[in-house]
Amino acid sequence: KGAYWDSEIKLGQELGVENYPVFTRKSLTDLSWMACALKLFKYQNHIFPAFATHNAYSIAFIEEFGKDKIFEFQRIHGMADVIHNYFNKYSNDNYQKCRIYAPVGNYDDLLPYLMRRLLENGANTSFVNKMNDPKLDIDEILIDPIKTINNYKQIKNPQIPLPPEIFLPERENSKGYDL
């Protein structure tokens, strides 16, 4: 999930590692994100949790588990305005819950960043596109990753062979080394 997922999968294949450094199913990444969020809330006396997301389920999860906590959301200018504005308007807190940022930088750094965001958020499966599809109902937008995971026959995505297996049955993938 996210802008670097494809490159992490590709690098794992190039290096011929035993397993991928990222989850091969989005729902597993979502569940991991939720577990990390709970850990941030647990240590709130040492840190100030800030959650950058435009996923409606993730936002609802944070709102529910952060009811009695102080935190903030973060989003890129122009992304998920409607849902973040809703939470800001209807929250019972006396502070602004969403920090909006606009990326800045030199051309060589900024353009690749913006392209990754465009690719990530332009995907047909992205929350941003789902939110703007009037044919989808709320249950198709708010997807509980635990329910999704419970329906899997196996945790590993069967559509993505492990790095050593990408050339099977012809041959096993070799180990790669970054010289």
Each PLM stretch: what is its role?
Residues 174-179:
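Short, intrinsically disordered, charge-balanced linker/junction segments flanking boundaries
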Residues 1-173:
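Positively charged, amphipathic and often flexible ligand-engagement surfaces
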